[in-house]
Design a protein with these regions (language model features):
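Glycine-rich phosphate/pyrophosphate-binding loop at beta-loop-alpha junctions
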Residues: 10-11, 16, 49-56, 78-172, ...
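Residue-level detector of anion-binding/catalytic polar loops
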Residues: 19, 42, 128, 191-192
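Anion (oxyanion) recognition and catalysis
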Residues: 14, 37, 64, 121, ...
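Short, small-residue-biased leader/transition segments that mark boundaries at the very start
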Residues: 1-5
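A glycine-rich helix N-cap at a beta->alpha junction
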Residues: 18-58, 62
């Protein structure tokens, strides 16, 4: 599971009485594990060296072992992009009065950037979309996947729901910058956000400084709290 989905699934399970099993890499943050368990979900950790692919494989195996189980398959679930097309993109369009010039979003499952980017480009083909990836694992730009600490983005595979044609460019962010900008969000803006949010904001600042976006609206998605 990625950084946010584990909490959401655990919350639904608690509210509806479902047994919820969350599989995540052992490298996920302590607070993520504690919070997910606090909602009553079971947490199974997979080796950090296997990345998110290892967690996906473990979840698939559990799905075959446990009768009546349902696999969310967030990296392959079309509901992800669909809900962002219907909600996130429409909210951005409405709140900017249709003046959004660029969208910056991290690429984890691919749901956010795919759904939001597709819909914004339908509304205005001139909107530019930027995907954010860890510099340490530049898979989106043809590089080698590798371990990194920016939980929530940069799985060590290309998710099936990620529309790689929707983004105009990919911005690679160093681990140290992601941490720094996450802290700056808290200290300077009062927004306590996660590391992937720090990476996204750092990328958005780079985009905003491009001459072509002077005086224009650049929207960044801050997904992790």
């Amino acid at each position: 599971s990625d950084v946010c989905s584990s909490d959401l699934l655990a919350m639904v399970g608690a509210a509806r009485g479902y047994r919820v099993i969350i599989v995540m890499p052992e490298s996920m943050s302590l607070e993520r594990k504690v919070l997910t368990r606090a909602y009553g979900a079971e947490v199974i950790l997979t080796p950090a060296t296997e990345g998110m692919a290892g967690s996906v494989a473990k979840a698939e195996a559990l799905g075959k072992e446990i009768p009546g189980s349902v696999l969310v398959r967030q990296f392959d679930n079309p509901a992800g992009p669909k809900i962002h097309r219907e909600t996130t993109a429409e909210e951005i369009w409405k709140d900017t009065d249709g003046k959004v010039a660029a969208l910056v979003a991290g690429s984890g499952t691919g749901g956010t950037i795919t759904g939001t980017g597709q819909r914004l480009k339908e509304l205005n083909p001139d909107v530019k979309v930027y995907a954010v990836q860890p510099a340490a694992s530049p898979l989106l730009t043809g590089g080698q996947a590798a371990g990194h600490p920016i939980a929530g983005i940069g799985p060590n595979f290309i998710p099936s729901i990620l529309d790689t044609s929707v983004y105009d460019d990919v911005i690679s962010i160093e681990n140290s910058d992601a941490f720094t900008w996450s802290r700056r969000l808290g200290a300077e803006e009062g927004i306590l956000a996660g590391i992937s949010s720090g990476a996204a904001v750092k990328a958005a600042v780079e985009v905003a400084h491009k001459p072509e976006f002077a005086g224009k609206i650049v929207v960044v998605i801050i997904p992790s709290f």
